UniProtKB/Swiss-Prot annotation:
GO terms for biological process: photosynthesis. The gene is psaA. Divinyl chlorophyll a binds at residues 706, 714. Induction: Transcription decreases upon iron starvation. It holds the Pfam family PsaA_PsaB. PsaA and PsaB bind P700, the primary electron donor of photosystem I (PSI), as well as the electron acceptors A0, A1 and FX. PSI is a plastocyanin/cytochrome c6-ferredoxin oxidoreductase, converting photonic excitation into a charge separation, which transfers an electron from the donor P700 chlorophyll pair to the spectroscopically characterized acceptors A0, A1, FX, FA and FB in turn. Oxidized P700 is reduced on the lumenal side of the thylakoid membrane by plastocyanin or cytochrome c6. [4Fe-4S] cluster binds at residues 606, 615. It comes from Prochlorococcus marinus (strain SARG / CCMP1375 / SS120). This is Photosystem I P700 chlorophyll a apoprotein A1. The chain crosses the membrane at residues 80-103, 166-189, 205-229, 315-333, 375-398, 414-440, 462-484, 564-582, 622-643, 687-709, 747-767. It is found in: Cellular thylakoid membrane. It is a multi-pass membrane protein. PSI electron transfer chain: 5 divinyl chlorophyll a, 1 divinyl chlorophyll a', 2 phylloquinones and 3 4Fe-4S clusters. PSI core antenna: 90 divinyl chlorophyll a, 22 carotenoids, 3 phospholipids and 1 galactolipid. P700 is a divinyl chlorophyll a/divinyl chlorophyll a' dimer, A0 is one or more divinylchlorophyll a, A1 is one or both phylloquinones and FX is a shared 4Fe-4S iron-sulfur center.
Length: 773
């Protein structure tokens, strides 16, 4: 369904606009439970009830498409805002469940006492049908499922030392969930914000940057300074075999730390751990005597050798500094209270690009209005940014491990990397989806003439054709290197292979960056690194290996020909994903094939009957295809990461990555086949559930092919034969069975393809590293 921009946000034709005196409408929509009993109440067509089975699928597809319910931007905004509170309630319930499991069903205190030998567990399988074999002996007199979420390591970093504290957090999570649910009801039914409130961009930026991000970060820094870092110092001393003495008492166990915790905010106690907490902190702060805080706000760099993680005092310093920057940044914007500061609209309207490289005479004029009226446009940008940030987090989790002992919990490291990569990929595909919707529903060509958006659309053929050329070049060359190596190895000619011992293709730029980082320490060559100790950089760069409990926490990562080859496969798959997603956005409204595509909406299977060769051209179909290539891209990434870390950092596969990963056969034989031995031989062991999951997820993946490889007509013909048989037996249903629409079939197909593929990989990775112990 297409909603033309001029009508969006209008209440009634000819109605006078209400003055913006109050930001909310009181008692906007009384709670009507009768309406909720009627499925599809928001659609005149769906509210009539089902006549065919298509009804249930349309109900799923359109339930959250608020645009199509009323076409009123204010009402849509209110629904989204209310739904945010509901989402937060779900998050708090989820967090509460994690805390509750930690409090009642975990070996958290046992893990705290011996984090290098005891494995984390927070779930116990009930022997309903004899599946108690899944409860492994994880140490600390505990049998249960080994968890790989990293929550134990995170809780230790927070300063949690007992199950009582976890139970308190669980109760707090439920209370917060109730408050959030109440907030969602209140801000839709009792005090619903007006559209003008949602459009006030500068106050929103101030609230987010100053209050949520800035003050939130500083508040967290306060917790780390007064609780997290002192508890970490006490626990680190215990783990190092040299307990600290506080008030004449040796703090020799986590229980001792728990008993001391209520007094950690007492300056007389805290100053025995960090002298700068002796009680003059406020005075030192306001007299700018900030050097007094150098023991609690540090810049040590590197990793704590006891825990193999970043120093807690470095982390508290980071959060304090980041919070201050965010507060300063938030004050940049002009608001209703005073006329000082920047206006986002004024900044964008005067901003112009390079006249030669990007000739758009009107620059960014009209973009502010577009984004302040298009929630899909805003969501697209936010999804792209958060998705990219998630991918950055994935890489920081192993390069700069933030939580104590997380770096030596290899299943958790691999699991968190994979998790954040998938989340990032899905969010970026979502960004393309909502950009396409914004172009179709919210974009008015008459408003955007000769600005940057118009300029990009005019250059779309050049952009896509160049991107296509890049994809072809990368694809043929990167894959060609592997094919060459397979042929040479098959013919017994190793010296003619691209490898570190044959024809070298060294990633000299990446090696140069590594050497630059290492050689700059103690000099003025690297900004901020002048005269700093050698530990100020991550051990990945300065050549050190950090071992904790006999396991490698972090080590230099050597780069060679194998890395250059797989890196170009990454470039290829990512660029193809970009090509598909970007084409779906740039051609969302029109193309040479279908000039009136905007009238057909976001998702449509083909341009009607009688016009062949126009299928899979909708913006939705581009997201559909992009999801497959996103999956392809990230599969290569997580496989590369898994093998590289096992081979060159963790020492699990004897350093075979450099010579085995340079052929397709090597990936199949030495990675997929060799490393699947744990999951394939898992029966009769605690990891047997991963063996079952491995098989089940393969089935889910294969199930998707039934939807992807067949057309709707095949199924409709089959259904009609089955209905005929039911009619003969007089057991025909009153709701007429219909085959899934083409688009619905594709949606079911891609959902099962991704779910099956991700769960298969999940079982493969977990069984591998948990099985190795």
């Amino acid at each position: 369904m297409t909603i033309s921009p001029p009508e969006r946000g209008e209440k009634a034709k000819g109605a006078a606009p209400t003055p913006y005196d109050q930001p909310v409408d009181r008692d906007h929509a009384p709670i009507d439970y009768e309406k909720l009993n009627k499925p599809g109440f928001w659609s005149s067509k769906l509210s009539k009830g089902p006549k065919t089975t298509t009804w249930i699928w349309n109900l799923h597809a359109d339930a959250h498409d608020f645009d199509t319910h009323l076409g009123d931007l204010e009402e849509t905004s209110r629904k989204i805002f209310s739904a945010h509170f509901g989402h937060l309630a779900v998050v708090f319930i989820w967090m509460s469940a994690a805390f509750f499991h930690g409090a009642r069903f975990s070996n958290y205190t046992g893990w705290l006492a011996d984090p290098t030998n005891v494995k984390p567990g927070a779930q116990v399988v009930w022997p309903v049908v004899g599946q108690e074999i899944l409860n492994a002996d994880l140490g600390g007199n505990y049998q249960g499922l080994q968890i790989t979420s990293g929550i134990f390591q995170m809780w230790r970093a927070w300063g949690i030392t007992s199950e009582v504290q976890l139970m308190a957090l669980a109760i707090g999570g439920v209370i917060m969930a109730a408050l959030m649910l109440h907030g969602g009801i209140y801000h839709y039914h009792k005090a619903a914000p007006k559209l003008e409130w949602f459009r006030k961009i500068e106050p929103m930026l101030q609230h987010h940057q100053i209050a949520l991000i800035g003050l939130g970060s500083i508040a967290w820094a306060g917790h780390l300074i007064h609780i997290g870092a002192p508890v970490a110092a006490l626990l680190d001393a215990i783990d190092a075999g040299n307990p600290l003495v506080v008030d004449g008492v040796s703090i020799a166990s986590a229980a001792d730390v728990t008993n001391l915790a209520p007094r950690l905010c007492d300056p007389a106690v805290a100053s025995q751990i960090f002298p700068s907490l002796a009680g003059r902190t406020v005075e030192n702060f306001f007299t700018l005597n900030w050097w007094a805080f150098t023991d609690i706000l540090t810049n040590k760099g590197g990793l704590n050798p006891v825990t193999g993680s970043l120093w807690m005092t470095d982390i508290s310093h980071h959060h304090l500094a980041f919070g201050v920057f965010a507060i300063f940044g938030g004050h940049m914007w002009r608001n209703n209270v005073h006329g000082v500061g920047h206006s986002m609209k004024e900044i964008m309207d005067v901003h112009k690009g390079d006249p030669i490289l990007f000739p758009a005479p009107k620059g960014h004029q009209g973009i502010f209005e577009f984004l302040s009226n298009s929630w899909h446009g805003q969501l697209s940008i936010n999804l792209a940014m958060v998705g990219s940030a998630s991918i950055v987090v994935a890489h920081h989790m192993y390069a700069l491990p933030p939580y104590p002992y997380i770096a030596i919990d290899y299943p958790t490291v691999l699991g968190l990397f994979t998790h954040h990569m998938w989340i990032g990929g899905l969010f970026i595909c979502g960004a393309a989806a909502h950009a396409g919707i914004a172009m179709i529903r919210d974009y008015d060509p008459a408003v955007h003439i000769d600005n940057v958006l118009d300029r990009i659309l005019k250059a779309r053929d050049a952009i896509i054709s160049h991107l296509n050329w890049v994809c072809m070049w990368l694809g043929f060359h990167s894959f060609g290197l592997y094919i060459h190596n397979d042929v040479m190895r098959a013919l017994g000619r190793p010296k003619d292979m691209f490898s570190d011992t044959g024809i070298q293709l060294q990633p000299f730029l990446a090696q140069w960056v590594q050497n630059l980082q290492q050689s700059a320490v103690g000099t003025g060559d690297l900004v901020g690194a002048g005269n700093l100790p050698g530990s100020v950089l991550s051990e990945v760069f300065n050549g050190n290996v950090v071992e904790v409990g006999g396991k490698v926490a972090i080590a230099p990562i050597p780069l060679g020909t194998a890395d250059l080859m797989i890196h170009h496969v990454h470039a290829f798959t990512i660029h193809v994903t970009l090509l598909i997603l970007l084409k779906g956005v740039l051609y969302a409204r029109s193309s040479r094939l279908i000039p009136d595509k905007a009238q057909l909406g976001f998702r449509f299977p083909c341009d009607g009957p009688g016009r062949g060769g126009t299928c899979q051209v909708s913006s939705w179909d581009h997201v559909f295809l992009g999801l497959f290539w996103m999956y392809n891209s990230l599969s290569v990434v997580i496989f590369h990461f898994s093998w590289k870390m096992q081979s060159d950092v963790w020492g699990l596969t004897g350093g075979n990555f450099a010579q085995s990963s340079i052929t397709i056969n090597g990936w199949l034989r030495d990675f997929l086949w060799a490393q699947s031995s744990q999951v394939l031989t898992s029966y009769g062991q605690p990891i047997s559930m991963y063996g079952l999951m491995f098989l089940g997820a393969h089935f889910v993946w294969a199930f998707s092919l039934m939807f992807l490889f067949s057309g709707r007509g095949y199924w409709q013909e089959l259904f009609e034969s089955i209905i005929w048989a039911h009619n003969k037996l007089k057991v025909a249903p009153t709701i007429q069975p219909r085959a899934l629409s083409i688009t619905q079939g594709r949606a079911v197909g891609v959902a099962h393809f991704l779910l099956g593929g991700i769960a298969t990989t999940w079982a493969f990775f977990h069984a591998r590293l948990i099985g190795l112990g």
